[in-house]
């Protein structure tokens, strides 16, 4: 049965450092025999929706492929591992998604899943009804 690794970094405003830390975790997962590594929602940047009044965070959105996905494609290809990431995608001017690209072990983008919006920061930690 294939091994699945779950990976999470302590993301900061330093996007290149975030990518490097993620790639190190991917290399470690591959070395331990994982065939697939999965990152959480908004796994490569601080969870910025809590600062929704600050428009500068839209500058962090990137296309697929873009800087983060291209970096992940290289490490996937080098280590023969499948990666499911999650980034803030800019699909077109004014069109943004919380997107999960799937990168194959050969480095190709196999597909992506897009959410229509990022969770509202004020309700994402609300008490449940039970």
Q: What are these model-predicted stretches?
A:
Residues 57-70:
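A short acidic, glycine-rich active-site loop
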Residues 68-83, 87:
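A structural motif corresponding to the C-terminal end of an alpha-helix
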Residues 1-13, 38, 99, 112:
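Active-site-proximal beta-strand elements of phosphoester/diester hydrolases
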Residues 10-13, 43-46, 91, 117-119:
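Feature marks short, surface-exposed loop/turn motifs that line or immediately flank catalytic pockets
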Residues 41-42, 86-89, 113:
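Short, well-ordered beta-to-alpha junction loops that form the rim of enzyme active sites
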Residues 4-7, 18, 26-56, 76, ...:
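Active-site beta-strand/loop signature of hydrolases that rely on acidic residues for catalysis
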Residues 64, 74, 90-130:
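Active-site catalytic loop in hydrolytic enzyme cores
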Residues 16-21, 65-66:
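Glycine-rich anion/phosphate-binding loops
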């Amino acid at each position: 049965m294939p091994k699945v690794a779950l990976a999470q970094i302590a993301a900061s405003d330093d996007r290149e450092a975030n990518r490097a830390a993620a790639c190190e975790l991917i290399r470690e997962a591959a070395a331990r025999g994982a065939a697939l590594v999965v990152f959480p929602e908004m796994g490569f940047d601080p969870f910025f929706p809590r600062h929704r009044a600050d428009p500068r965070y839209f500058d962090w959105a990137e296309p697929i492929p873009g800087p983060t996905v291209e970096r992940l494609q290289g490490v996937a290809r080098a280590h023969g591992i499948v990666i499911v990431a999650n980034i803030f995608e800019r699909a077109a001017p004014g069109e943004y998604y919380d997107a999960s690209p799937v990168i194959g072990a050969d480095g190709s983008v196999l597909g992506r899943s897009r959410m229509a919006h990022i969770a509202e920061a004020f309700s994402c930690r609300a008490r449940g009804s039970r």
